[in-house]
Every structure is written in structure tokens, then in C-alpha cells.
């Protein structure tokens, strides 16, 4: 459910948003996880959705069935695995965490615009240094996915890697510092186009590039997190450099800073195998005559696409800042209610 208010300058840039006020059923998701019981069990994952809206420059919007994950995880060594199939690329904590597990209803604009949703490929991942470090790398080409060109060579190929480190962990493990970074290269055979909504789903694109063909592109990503008891601070920076003489090698970048405080005192656990944070463990659910878990959050995000050609004549792709506040009520680990407020500024006609 959205309630939207805008000024005249906003109407001039993106049109009247009254039609985007209201509610929608975003999607019905379903799937399963199981094992093939060898000496070292293989894990299979299948998840999909109907009427699903999956954001990102290489994701597909469809009213039909959308396959999110079709993955097989094969253990190689004790703390190293090999994954094959349609899966998340190993880059960015915000992208690797499930959307519903974060403090905000939507990811930051830069994450959806410059980082992919899912892709078809292979990934090798493992943990090191007493589970204080993770390394993951993969190669991807989505020629087997729906609505893609028919041959492997006609599709863009990506090489993606991520490394994380926990340089500090307190004796009682309540305080933890996480740092990480990732790289993503693509040969851009399918061209480049991207867009970003103002961090609410039922909205038009506020930022949008034109479609063009760079020689290739490189994305750099960095992240840092501090968790101290119920407090969690997280930030990420993402930058994409496009090799395009026609448009003077444009750079697109942005960052976000997020703060979360769990009012009921739960501590968000850390998944050392992947280098991400897990969902809030509800200490006492409403089914146990408790109050569930309550969380407040705040985020600032910024996205700059102004060096890229815009999708509208006479405009560049735009710059956007978003200030957000959120309140989450987890009744159980599987059910929550939340409300978000956004204040958005946009410049597309600099």
C-alpha cells in the first residue's frame, strides 16, 4: 500500500504519481530445499514466484511464473562448496540477503540499479581463517534463461567475486565488525540499460539510462557492517565504469548507509559461511503470548547516473537522494508488518 505526495517540480520530472497510490499483491513465492544423501550431502534449492517483480538491470518482469533459484550446492572440501544453476551472484551483502530480512521494505536504489538479481552460472565459495574470512567467485552467462538469445556467444558473460573479513569479534560475540568488497566484470554483449525506482515498488522509474553498447564494464563494490547487541550499522558503495567512447566512458555510482535498532533486544545473528546477517531471531512470538520483535530503521541512499545518456530526450539519466525511516513488527520469524516513510529528491534536467 502506497500513499504518495509530490511537488510541481516532481510532477514535471516524472509525471503525476496519483495513479501509483494504492495497494497490490506483489507476488506469491514458493519453493523448496532438500538434499541428495551422498556421503557429503548435496543440497538442491528451487524457488519461484507468480506475478513477481524482480528488480535489477538483468532481471525480467513477468506476470507469468518466474524461476528465482534452481541451484545445486556440492561440497568440495570441509568448508568449500561448488554451486551450479540459477542463483545470486556473489557480490554485496544487501543483494545476498533476502529482501524480507532487512530493516527496509526495499533495497537501496544503487543496489537494484547496478547489481544483478540472479544469473545462471557456477560459483566456488568457502571460509577461511577460523571462519573469519569468506571468498567466493563465479562465472555467469544466462543463455539458458527465459527470453534470452539462443546461443552462449550471443549473451553477455560475467565474472564476479567477493571477499569478506571479520577483523573484530568481542569475547561474548555480541559486537562484530564486518568488511567486504566485490568485483563484477561483463563483456556487455547484450548492451547496457538500467533504471531505478525511488525505493518503493509500485512506482515509475525515477532514474533511467538509454540503451547503448559499451565495449565492457567493471563494477566495484565495498561494504562495512558493525553490530553491537541490538544495534546494526551497515553501508555499501557501488560504482560501475562503462567503456564507451561514444559517451565519454560514463561512471554510475552510489551508496547507502543504514541503521537498525531492535527495540526488544534481540541480536541479529551473523552467517560466517556466507558473510551476511541472518533474520532477527524473535525471542518471544505472539503465539507464545509475547510481543514479537520490534525494529526501527533509518537509511540514506544516493544514486548518480548523470554521466550516462538518459531515456528521455533532453535529460541525462539523473541523480536521486532518498531518506527513509522504517518500523518493523515481527510477530513470528515468518510473519511481519512494517511501515516505511521516504523523502526523495530527483534531478534529471541538470
Locate the predicted segments by residue.
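Surface-exposed beta-strand-turn/loop segments characteristic
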Residues: 9-13
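Outer-membrane beta-barrel pore domains
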Residues: 16-17, 175, 183, 190-350
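Outer membrane beta-barrel
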Residues: 1-5, 15-189, 251-288, 293-308
Amino acid at each position: 500500500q502506497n500513499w504518495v505526495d509530490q511537488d510541481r517540480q516532481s510532477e514535471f520530472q516524472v509525471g503525476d504519481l496519483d495513479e501509483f497510490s494504492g495497494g497490490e499483491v506483489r507476488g506469491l513465492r514458493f519453493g523448496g530445499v532438500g538434499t541428495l544423501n551422498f556421503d557429503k550431502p548435496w543440497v538442491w534449492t528451487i524457488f519461484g514466484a507468480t506475478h513477481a517483480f524482480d528488480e535489477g538491470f538483468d532481471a525480467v518482469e513477468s506476470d507469468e511464473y518466474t524461476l528465482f533459484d534452481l541451484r545445486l550446492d556440492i561440497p568440495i572440501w570441509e568448508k568449500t562448496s561448488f554451486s551450479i544453476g540459477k542463483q545470486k551472484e556473489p557480490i554485496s551483502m544487501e543483494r545476498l540477503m533476502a529482501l524480507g530480512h532487512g530493516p527496509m521494505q526495499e533495497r537501496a536504489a544503487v543496489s537494484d540499479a547496478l547489481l544483478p538479481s540472479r544469473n545462471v552460472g557456477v560459483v566456488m565459495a568457502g571460509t577461511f581463517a577460523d571462519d573469519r574470512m569468506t571468498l567466493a567467485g563465479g562465472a555467469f552467462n544466462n543463455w539458458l534463461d527465459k527470453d534470452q538469445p539462443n546461443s552462449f556467444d550471443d549473451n553477455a558473460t560475467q565474472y564476479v567475486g567477493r571477499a569478506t573479513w571479520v577483523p573484530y569479534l568481542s569475547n561474548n560475540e555480541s559486537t562484530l565488525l564486518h568488511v567486504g568488497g566485490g568485483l563484477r566484470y561483463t563483456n556487455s554483449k547484450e548492451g547496457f540499460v538500467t533504471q531505478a525506482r525511488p525505493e518503493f515498488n509500485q512506482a515509475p522509474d525515477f532514474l533511467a539510462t538509454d540503451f547503448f553498447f559499451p565495449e565492457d564494464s567493471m563494477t566495484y563494490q565495498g561494504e562495512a557492517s558493525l553490530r553491537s547487541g541490538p544495534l546494526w550499522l551497515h553501508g555499501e558503495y557501488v560504482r560501475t565504469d562503462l567503456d564507451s567512447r561514444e559517451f565519454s566512458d560514463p561512471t554510475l555510482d552510489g551508496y547507502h548507509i543504514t541503521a537498525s535498532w531492535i527495540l526488544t533486544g534481540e541480536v541479529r545473528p551473523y552467517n560466517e559461511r556466507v558473510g551476511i546477517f541472518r533474520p532477527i531471531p524473535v525471542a518471544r512470538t505472539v503465539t507464545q503470548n509475547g510481543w514479537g520483535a520490534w525494529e526501527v530503521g533509518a537509511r540514506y541512499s544516493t544514486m548518480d547516473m548523470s554521466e550516462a545518456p538518459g531515456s528521455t530526450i533532453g535529460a541525462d539519466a539523473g541523480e536521486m537522494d532518498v531518506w527513509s525511516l522504517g518500523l518493523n513488527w515481527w510477530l513470528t520469524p515468518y510473519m511481519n508488518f512494517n511501515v516505511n516513510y521516504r523523502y526523495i529528491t530527483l534531478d534529471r534536467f541538470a
